Amino acid sequence: MLTQRQKKILQAIVRQYTSTGQPVGSKHLAEKLPFKVSSATVRNEMAVLEDNDLILKEHSSSGRIPSKRGYRYYVDNLLDPQAVTDNDLVVIQNSLGNGFQKIDEIISHSADILSNLTSYTAFTLKPEQESVRLSGFRVVPLGNHKVIAILVTDSGEVENQSFTLPPDIDTDAMQAVIRMINDQLVGLPLSEVVKRLKDDIPLQVLHYMHSPDGFLDIFDNVLSQAARERFFVGGRLNLLDFASTHDPHAIQSLYGLLDKNDNLSNILDSTLTSDNGVNVKIGQEISKNKLLDDYSLITASYNVEQYGRGIIAVLGPTRMPYSRTIGIVNAFRQELAKRLLDFYRHYYDS
């Protein structure tokens, strides 16, 4: 259990180090503390913090820096989120006020805005797809057994992919199956459509075709595109600014983490349950991947009422200014939720 003075000293060390990037010495710290204390006393208290693995001594300096455990203690017990500045709030509101035509445009642009505000790598995930329903599915022949499959949702999203049909598929039978799919599945949530596609729909297709596999694979592929979680990344190169290694293979692997949805899904915990919707992970708490040992991840959910919940996140060095960054993330999620709610209401009311 730390004393109040030890807590204040640890808080000051974290704030000083995240601001300057330089190890903090006892003499300088004594001058910055909000109470009068000698540098010898500060030195003794820092020794206690070091014994508790909350701060570390760097070999090249007599000063101390926070440890991962020290950052964790600071975030959990000593953090005082900084209110977003008026200037940053205006930037957020103006950037989200542009004339967007699709939800994905807003979410993608949001990642860039958040990255620019923090100078770190930012992630955004569109609201969950629970409320999105199938509006229609059709297949347009292109000739030579090639078709384009088109799926439309009630949120205005349109997914299309080109395919080559198996030569044994009868086009009349295919159109009959498409009518059956629209008759039975239009109006259902995409999650229910996915379930039906695995359960009873294949059996019904057998009334029209010898095997459901060839054609249903097409529908399944387009449906998967519409139902997938969509992460957008802003400021990819910012991640490399704080890399602790100059090994080109390690840097390539670090950059590659951002290229696959599976990686991002594992890194971004999409099951946030905290009431305030903000979560901070430090070092190995983020991932078992050692490339992220010197990074921290601030994740926040945003709620768009009945239209679902999405996620925004910032990935930066463990020595990021947590108070300011959390303040920006918190303000951003609120403004993004407002903007998306306006968009959804406009779409459904029009």
From Swiss-Prot:
The keyword Transcription applies. It comes from Limosilactobacillus reuteri (strain DSM 20016) (Lactobacillus reuteri). This is Heat-inducible transcription repressor HrcA. InterPro entries: GAF-like_dom_sf, HrcA, HrcA_C, WH-like_DNA-bd_sf, WH_DNA-bd_sf, WHTH_HrcA_DNA-bd, WHTH_transcript_rep_HrcA_IDD. Pfam families: HrcA (PF01628), HrcA_DNA-bdg (PF03444). GO terms for biological process: negative regulation of DNA-templated transcription. PANTHER family: HEAT-INDUCIBLE TRANSCRIPTION REPRESSOR HRCA (PTHR34824:SF1). Keywords: Repressor, Stress response, Transcription, Transcription regulation. Belongs to the HrcA family. It comes from the Bacteria. Negative regulator of class I heat shock genes (grpE-dnaK-dnaJ and groELS operons). Prevents heat-shock induction of these operons. The lineage of its organism: Bacteria, Bacillati, Bacillota, Bacilli, Lactobacillales. One of its GO terms (molecular function) is DNA binding.
